[in-house]
């Protein structure tokens, strides 16, 4: 479940902090969130795809670690990122 180039560029443009930003934490979390959403939809129709389920859990863990890093650095960046992506209540 990979993202095509246009989808990646759209996510990068939406979440980048400056013009040439492609690897900031915000962009990484946004990319992971999109891949997690796609893989979750896949797993709803393919319940027995255990290797994809394991990959999904790894991506969720990576996103959690990145969000914890952002939260330690700046609470305002964390809260704006979470609300922008619509994750966590």
From Swiss-Prot:
Domain of life where this protein originates: Bacteria
Protein's UniProt keywords contain Acyltransferase: no
CDD domains registered for this protein in UniProt: Ribosomal_S15p_S13e (cd00353)
Family matches, as SMART domains: Ribosomal_S15
GO biological process, one term: translation
Annotated region described as Disordered, given as residue ranges: 1-23
Keywords: Ribonucleoprotein, Ribosomal protein, RNA-binding, rRNA-binding
MF term (GO), any: rRNA binding
One cellular component term from this protein's GO annotations in UniProt: cytosolic small ribosomal subunit
Pfam family, one: Ribosomal_S15
Record's subunit section: Part of the 30S ribosomal subunit. Forms a bridge to the 50S subunit in the 70S ribosome, contacting the 23S rRNA.
NCBIfam families found in the cross-reference section: S15_bact
Stated family: Belongs to the universal ribosomal protein uS15 family.
Biological function: One of the primary rRNA binding proteins, it binds directly to 16S rRNA where it helps nucleate assembly of the platform of the 30S subunit by binding and bridging several RNA helices of the 16S rRNA. Forms an intersubunit bridge (bridge B4) with the 23S rRNA of the 50S subunit in the ribosome.
Record PANTHER family: RIBOSOMAL PROTEIN S15, BACTERIAL AND ORGANELLAR, SMALL RIBOSOMAL SUBUNIT PROTEIN US15M
Name the UniProt record assigns to this protein: Small ribosomal subunit protein uS15
Organism for this UniProt entry: Prochlorococcus marinus (strain SARG / CCMP1375 / SS120)
């Amino acid at each position: 479940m990979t993202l095509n180039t246009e989808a990646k560029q759209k996510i990068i443009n939406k979440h980048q902090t400056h013009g040439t930003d492609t690897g900031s934490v915000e962009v990484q979390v946004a990319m992971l969130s999109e891949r997690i959403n796609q893989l979750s939809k896949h797993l709803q129709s393919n319940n027995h795809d255990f290797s994809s389920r394991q990959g999904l859990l790894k991506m969720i863990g990576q996103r959690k670690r990145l969000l914890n890093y952002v939260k330690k650095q700046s609470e305002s960046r964390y809260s704006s990122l979470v609300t922008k992506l619509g994750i966590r209540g």
